[in-house]
Amino acid sequence: MAFFRGQAAPLPPGGARRAPGGLAGAVRAPPGGRGLRAPSAIGSGRSRGPGRLLPPPPGGLCNACGGARRRRRVPAAASPRPPREAEEGSVSVVLLAGGVGKRMGAAMPKQYLPLRGKPIALHSLAVFEALPEVAEVVVVCDPAYRDLFEAAAATPLKFAEPGAERQDSVSNGLARISSASALVAVHDSARPLVTAGEVQACIGDALEHGAAVLGVPVKPTIKEADGAGFVAKTLQRSLLWEVQTPQIIRPALLRAGFELVAAEGLEVTDDVSVVEALGEPVKITLGRYTNIKVTTPDDMSVAEGFLAEREAAVAA
């Protein structure tokens, strides 16, 4: 027995079988007949159980009944919200280049040592100057090195004096930025391998949360020691991050943090620590392990290797 277009297929004994998701299952044709797949609507209605038919769905009948079957709407999967983008010229950079670099054991501060023919600090400067989001760069350095930066800069620079501690240097640089800046990015000039993509990702997180810092999950096991040099406990590695720079913060938030640190005599070792002291959130932006701080001769060799690989990749 064959079924023709427009003819309702008889339900099997007990009614139509329901397929997962609430649709009727396939109807088996009698021997010698042509099989017919029963959609959600059969004949003039939809099967909801043995012998029970409901009115046809809005929009018409199914194909088996000679009408147009309404397609089932499937909700779209939620897509992640794209990162926020800063407006052009809305970010000020404080480039820290006032360190002495005693651990390098060189005749000059580490940030001025040549790395593949160019001082380390100038590699860092070039990354930020090329970003459309960056309006200005304030270089915190000894006045004796200002000419070095001015000769290499693509745009006019501002300068600030280094302080006794890192937070003093950052505060001096912060005092020189434009009042129109939405964000201030603080970067160690001795990190010459940071990429434009990393900086822009961190800018997006800072716009969203008020403060952000580049970081990478720690690889080794970290142990906390007591005063006598014995292991006190092993820290949970999955929760630990090594933070880098840039550290990007809303200027008003950074200023408020510095005021609190000064008022309470707090000791901080990086810039987002002052935001933490305020109880405000700091987002960690996933960075790369190549964004090293050149501090020792071994670091210099590693940085040379990474930079050579990048140059070779660009030339290929």
Residues of each region from the PLM?
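Residue-level signal for inorganic ion chemistry
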Residues: 95, 121, 173, 187-188, ...
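N-terminal glycine-rich phosphate-binding loop and ensuing alpha1 helix
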Residues: 86-146
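Short aromatic/basic micro-patch
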Residues: 114, 193, 234, 248, ...
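N-terminal plastid-targeting presequences
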Residues: 72-85
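Short, flexible, basic/aromatic active-site loop/helix in glycosyltransferases
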Residues: 223-247
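N-terminal chloroplast transit peptides
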Residues: 1-66
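Conserved beta-loop-beta/alpha segment of the NTase-like Rossmann-fold superfamily
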Residues: 158-159, 164-225, 244
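Conserved alpha/beta core of the MobA/IspD/sugar-nucleotide pyrophosphorylase nucleotidyltransferase superfamily
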Residues: 240-316
